[in-house]
């Protein structure tokens, strides 16, 4: 009798904590995998002397009569496109933050073989840096009707939006950049509520490499639950949970880019959004950033001086650590 009680209690514990192995049939699993491939892209940010590659996820919204595609990614993926310009307005000096366009790259595969890629330019709509903000960015693809599918974000009030420890997950991202575009890995939620630099992360065992930054983490039904940002080795990676993305989006009036049930603004209103709002004085582009963290480096792929014949790769630490040959 005691054994039965213990067994029943253990079963209840496994079910309530999410440790049960989901039984998705092969057909459904393949549908989810194909869907995640469709909504995942590589993001390439190429400045004069460096090129960085990360990952992103697509969401489409109807803006007026047009189907407009937006991309969620990490702030540090597009940081090297950030420029600060000094102007005089009303007799006083002001600093304007501007971003160059990044490239959104979609891999094309037919009959099990890569057949090419599609590249589109995208502007930065909203940005929060890794030092003073949430390390998030919302991009807008300039071409209309770009995406066929759209991410489905796990927005819920249940359990405060927390995905239980032990829940099985997928990650799709550009592991090692474009050469590993749309790689799919699996793991679980290994811990929740990690605090690093005063911000909140969830921990996961999904495999990630430089280039995974900005890539989505999903439930086995394909719902988006987080974004890979940092890693400390195989089986120990940190993601921005959707609940944190939701708070930031709400604060900056872009929740419509997560929740399709909300009405989207006009294109004029979107373009009028301030790109960067940190609550701090605007930093110069060459000001040192505290990206270096030996325990939890950012999962972005950097190629130093793309003009050199031999391309050098490293995990991004901070801008002052990138030794660029200015020729």
Where are these regions (language model features)?
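Flexible, gly/ser-rich surface segments that form the specificity/activation loops bordering the active-site cleft
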Residues: 28, 116, 126-130, 148-200, ...
């Amino acid at each position: 009798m005691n054994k039965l009680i213990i067994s029943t209690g253990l079963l209840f514990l496994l079910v309530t904590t999410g440790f049960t192995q989901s039984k998705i049939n092969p057909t459904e699993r393949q549908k989810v995998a194909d869907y995640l491939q469709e909504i995942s892209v590589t993001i390439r940010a190429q400045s004069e002397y460096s090129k960085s590659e990360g990952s992103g996820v697509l969401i489409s919204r109807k803006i007026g009569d047009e189907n407009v595609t937006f991309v969620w990614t990490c702030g540090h993926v597009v940081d090297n496109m950030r420029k600060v310009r000094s102007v005089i307005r009303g007799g006083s000096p002001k600093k304007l933050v501007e971003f160059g366009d990044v490239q959104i790259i979609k891999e094309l595969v037919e009959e099990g073989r890569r057949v090419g890629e599609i590249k589109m330019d995208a502007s930065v709509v909203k940005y929060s840096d890794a030092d003073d903000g949430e390390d998030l960015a919302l991009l807008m693809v300039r071409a209309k009707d770009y995406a066929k599918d759209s991410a489905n974000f796990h927005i819920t009030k249940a359990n405060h939006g927390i995905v239980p420890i032990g829940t099985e997950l997928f990650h799709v991202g550009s592991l090692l950049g474009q050469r590993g575009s749309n790689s799919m890995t699996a793991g679980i939620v290994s811990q929740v509520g990690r605090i690093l630099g005063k911000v909140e992360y969830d921990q996961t065992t999904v495999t990630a490499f430089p280039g995974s930054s900005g890539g989505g983490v999903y439930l086995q039904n394909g719902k988006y639950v987080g974004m890979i940002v940092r890693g400390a080795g195989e089986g120990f990676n940190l993601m921005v949970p959707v609940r944190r993305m939701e708070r930031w989006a709400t604060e900056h009036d872009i929740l419509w880019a997560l929740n399709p049930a909300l009405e989207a603004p006009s294109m004029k209103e979107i373009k009028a959004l301030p790109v960067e709002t940190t609550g701090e004085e605007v930093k110069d582009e060459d000001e040192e950033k505290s990206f270096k963290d030996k325990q939890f480096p950012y999962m972005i792929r950097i190629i130093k001086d793309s003009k050199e014949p031999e391309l050098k790769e490293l995990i991004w630490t901070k801008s002052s650590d990138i030794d660029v040959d200015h020729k």
